[in-house]
Amino acid sequence: MKYHFSSMEPWWKREFSFCIPAIYIKMASISLFQNSWLKMKHLPSCLFTQTTNTLGIYRKKKPNHSRDNPRINSNLSTNYAQAKSVERSRSNSLNSGPNPLENAT
């Protein structure tokens, strides 16, 4: 015999009484997954790199920060110096002509 809700119960009990256990199960499974993931993160990384390198998934990338990489630093400084020299030569060529303010009487 099927269970019928009485009409005296509020509508939210009739509608959501079967949804609540499903929500609890979902939340519990999510928390279990998060806990296991946190525990896995504390394991030494060599375990993960060894297993995933065979699959070719994990590749350690070198940091590409300019302050850490001397080659990039030298390139930046030479580019800056070249830009400054070009700027100086332009300003010198502009100023090398006759000054109109001096000739004005």
UniProtKB/Swiss-Prot annotation:
GO-annotated cellular components: mitochondrion
Cell location: Mitochondrion
Region described as Disordered: spans on this chain: 58-105
Keywords: Mitochondrion
Polar residues composition-biased segments: 71-82, 91-105
Keyword Mitochondrion recorded: yes
Protein name: Uncharacterized mitochondrial protein AtMg01400
Species the sequence originates in: Arabidopsis thaliana (Mouse-ear cress)
